[in-house]
Design a protein with these regions (language model features):
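Membrane-lumen/periplasm interface segments of specific transmembrane helices
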Residues: 207-279, 308-315
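Short periplasmic/luminal acceptor-recognition loop of GT-C membrane glycosyltransferases, typified by
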Residues: 394, 402-442, 455-460, 490
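Signature aromatic-anchored transmembrane alpha helix within multi-pass, membrane-resident enzymes
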Residues: 171, 212-217, 343-378
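Perimembrane helix-loop-helix junctions
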Residues: 153-161, 173, 185-217, 283-293
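Transmembrane alpha-helix segments characteristic
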Residues: 119, 124, 168-173, 213-217, ...
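Membrane-proximal, lumen/periplasm-facing interface regions of secretory-pathway glyco-
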Residues: 13-14, 325, 358-406, 421-425, ...
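Hydrophobic/aromatic-rich transmembrane helices and adjacent perimembrane loops
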Residues: 140, 185, 321-348
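Short acidic/glycine- and proline-prone juxtamembrane loop motifs at membrane-interface regions
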Residues: 132-143
Length: 654
């Protein structure tokens, strides 16, 4: 609750913005279709599957796995008369809390100790990646909770409390797997153990076979219905296996998971605790001082089957693990939690004086230090960097519904968005349906322009790189009719009157210009200067092999005293001597506090030993305070030699 409260009404941003916005779009779709559960829809008229957004279906209905955890928030949205995301956040968060309550009950049964059970819950809840998604939008969190509830019901059945608890376990296992089919793995693990018990004549087959049969019939029926929707309407949700193409790719993915995601899955304190309980459990077994409570031993079979199934799923979906950290929650998270509980169950109850109190202090200490690491992880995850265009799109489209309405765009008009970062992201904010075009090549953009739409919207900060650089003829196809700080609203161009790029983007007259031609005195402060070998009357700037940072500028006066965003146009010539990477860096900083950072690669847009003249338009975000300095420099980490000439920095108000 502490981590989630201040983000309770936040639209999905930062990590997996795309996936989480897709879930919010489903909830909004149910609100729009009067809560028709069997026709889930979002905002997209050209779906990702099967034709990769290239086919306009003109229907927003999309196939998706049993979207009950998108539907329930929609019911409350409809009842409260609002689509604000806090309803979705609160639903997922409350579901997770219920799951942890049952995890405590389950762990207490397995471990036979309230203190050990509390440690298991703290271990689970303090996972950095779990905490990030705990109040989010993914169905993984409710499915984790339902699986834990199912395991607790199974534990009651296992203790001999009656057949009804097995049926409740079937219900919650089915409910978990319906929303996220990956959770069929723990279901199968439990059924596998039940088969062993049946063969050993410790459980009966016939009393439960009907319940299991009905459960799988429901699961297969749901999958069949989803496949029919997919065949008829298409889908924006993955439904195929994505194994690694070869052993080398698998090894690279494992390396990335180790290097990048290891401490996202669990903190260093988690790994230490796992190591500690394994060592203590082994010692307890060797000296025969282990817990004499035997009922938990059957859980080791379930844990083994579960981990085996998770590993098999990893091989089947290796590429998704590379790009989607929440797949860890779908697979390995709960069996690891169960493994820790089982190791703790082996440990005997402390016989020394105040033993339970000392254990409770250790549990409290673990909770404090692990939550501190998790808190730092949450802060790092929630930082906006300029190359995160998914979060940038959320920011750019904020308030777009009102902007479009004031510009005369009806709520029934169809919108085209070219080069979307997460197809549903702009349409959620615009509250309108439309076409999402990837826009990676001219054919893709031409195709989108040929469809039936009323208006097209571009993101101003990304227009130059994402649209104009790929398709400069766009100025002949559409004309700008309204512009705000982040968006350009256009309609089809019906005349042949030319329009300039600056007019199209509504970038007006400059208010400050800084020129560096390496001839005047003020040009000599930033860089070494030498005579141009090709022209006796010209001097050029020079960045040597040992200059990691060169041509540095700090702009404070030029960006003005107010905190609003600015547009910076950088124009200049450069020549590079070798293949070492060079790039432009633009940043807002105050001491060591970095608020904004953007890089522009120069190596990929130039040829060796040839002068290249380029112009870049950078949309600078609002500053947090007047103390932030705008910095510009050329980054040369790989010992290149770079020549520069005739640079100009022009500032515009946004």
């Amino acid at each position: 609750m502490i981590f989630q409260f201040k983000h309770l009404n936040e639209v999905p941003m930062y990590t997996h913005t795309w996936a989480q916005n897709d879930r919010l779009a489903l909830a909004n779709g149910f609100v729009r279709n009067d809560l028709n559960f069997f026709k889930p829809q979002n905002y997209i008229l050209n779906h990702q599957f099967p034709k990769n957004w290239s086919d306009p279906s003109y229907s927003t209905i999309t196939a998706v796995e049993f979207p009950i955890h998108d539907y329930v928030p929609a019911v409350f949205m409809k009842a409260f008369g609002t689509n604000e995301p806090w309803i979705f956040h609160a639903y997922i968060l409350l579901y997770s809390i219920i799951g942890f309550f049952f995890l405590y009950l389950l762990a207490e049964k397995i471990c036979g100790s309230k203190v050990k059970a509390a440690l298991v819950v703290l271990f689970a809840i303090a996972s950095p990646i779990y905490t990030f998604y705990q109040g989010g939008f993914l169905p993984t969190i409710p499915s984790i909770a339902n699986t834990v509830i199912a395991l607790y019901c199974y534990a009651l059945y296992f203790e001999g409390k009656g057949e009804k608890w097995f049926r409740w376990a079937l219900f919650f296992f089915t409910f978990a797997a319906l929303a996220r089919f990956t959770f069929v793995i723990p279901y199968l693990a439990v059924l596998g153990f039940e088969l062993i018990r049946i063969f050993r004549k410790k459980a009966k087959f016939w009393p439960n076979v009907i319940g299991v049969g009905v459960s799988f019939l429901v699961l297969f029926a749901a999958q069949f219905y989803t496949s029919r929707l997919r065949a008829k309407y298409g889908s924006d949700f993955l439904s195929e296996l994505l194994p690694a193409d070869n052993f080398e790719e698998m090894k690279n993915i494992l390396t990335r998971m180790w290097d990048v995601m290891l401490y996202a899955y669990l903190s260093a304190k988690h790994y230490f605790l796992i190591f500690l309980v394994i060592i203590l459990a082994l010692i307890s077994i060797l000296i025969k001082e282990r817990n004499t409570y035997k009922a938990f031993l059957g859980w080791w079979f379930i844990c083994l089957f579960w981990l085996t199934g998770a590993c098999l799923f990893w091989f089947a979906m290796t590429k998704q693990f590379y790009a989607h950290d929440y797949y860890f929650l779908d697979t390995f998270y709960l069996p690891i939690v169960l493994f820790v509980a089982l190791c703790l169950a082996i440990l005997p109850k402390p016989q020394w004086y105040y033993g339970e109190a000392i254990m409770a202090l250790f549990v409290a200490y673990f909770g404090i230090v692990s939550f501190k690491e998790t808190s730092n992880f949450q802060k790092e995850r929630r930082v906006f960097v300029a190359n995160d265009h998914f979060t940038g799109s959320v920011i750019n489209f904020e308030g777009s519904d009102e902007f479009l309405t004031k510009s005369g765009v009806s709520s029934e008009d169809t919108i085209l968005v070219i080069h979307t970062y997460g197809p549903n992201i702009p349409f959620i904010q615009m509250n309108r349906v439309g076409f999402a075009v990837e826009g990676h090549d001219t054919g893709d953009i031409d195709r989108g322009l040929s469809w039936k739409w009323d208006y097209v919207v571009f993101q101003r900060p990304y227009f130059m790189d994402d649209v104009y650089a790929i398709y400069p003829d766009i100025l002949q196809k559409v004309e700008s009719i309204a512009v705000n700080e982040n968006l350009i609203l256009c309609k089809r161009k019906t005349d042949t009157i030319p329009q300039t790029l600056m007019d199209f983007m509504n970038i007006k007259k400059t208010y400050a210009i800084v020129k560096t031609n390496f001839e005047t005195t003020d040009s000599l402060n930033y860089i070494a200067v030498e005579n141009d070998p090709t022209s006796a009357n010209n001097r050029i700037g020079w960045i040597g092999e040992n200059d990691v940072y060169g041509f540095s500028h700090g702009f404070r006066k030029e960006i003005g005293s107010d905190l609003r965003g600015r547009v910076l146009k950088v124009k200049g010539k450069f020549l590079r001597r070798n293949d070492g990477q060079i790039s432009i860096v633009i940043a807002y900083s105050k001491g060591d506090d970095l608020a904004y950072y953007q890089t522009i690669d120069l190596s990929s847009i130039s040829k060796l030993n040839e002068w290249t003249e380029k112009e870049f338009i950078i949309f600078l975000p609002p500053r947090q305070s007047k103390e932030y300095l705008l910095s510009f420099y050329i980054h040369n980490p790989n010992k290149n030699t770079v020549l520069l000439d005739d640079f100009e920095f022009a500032f515009y108000r946004n």
